[in-house]
Amino acid sequence: MADPVRQRILLAVCDVLYIDETDLIDGDATDLRDLGLDSVRFVLLMKRLGVDRESELPSRLAENLSIEGWVSELSQSELESPT
């Protein structure tokens, strides 16, 4: 079964950056800046992913601008957040 966090991130990234999964030349480790991620698109992705811009999560996501890094951070964030 596919990881739902990865799928959500991948769909948002592909939509915002106008790319296809095949454009991830290094797979999930591809640096999203190489595919057109800039500060404006980063903010748009945070909105699409439901990330609170006032939290520390955006700065943690900015440390590793890849699908792989974001899956790790968002999965951890979901584990830490109360349900």
UniProtKB/Swiss-Prot annotation:
> What effect does gene inactivation have here?
Deletion of the gene cluster mmaABCDE causes a significant decrease in the intracellular accumulation of zinc in Sauton's medium where metal concentrations are relatively low.
- Name the coenzymes or cofactors required: pantetheine 4'-phosphate
Alphabetic keyword roster: Fatty acid metabolism, Lipid metabolism, Phosphopantetheine, Phosphoprotein
SUPFAM superfamilies in alphabetical order? ACP-like
User: Could you tell me which Pfam families the record lists for this protein?
Assistant: PP-binding (PF00550)
Carrier domain residues are: 3-83
Q: What does the record give as its pathway?
A: Lipid metabolism; fatty acid metabolism
Residue ranges of coiled coil: none
- O-(pantetheine 4'-phosphoryl)serine occurs at 39
Q: Which GO terms describe its biological process?
A: fatty acid metabolic process
Query: What is this protein's function?
Result: Acyl-carrier protein (ACP) involved in the biosynthesis of a unique class of isonitrile lipopeptides (INLPs) that seem to play a role in metal acquisition in M.marinum. Is the dedicated ACP for the loading of activated acyl groups catalyzed by MmaC.
Q: Family assignment?
A: Belongs to the acyl carrier protein (ACP) family.
- Protein name stated in the entry: Acyl carrier protein MmaB
What is the species of this protein?
A: Mycobacterium marinum (strain ATCC BAA-535 / M)
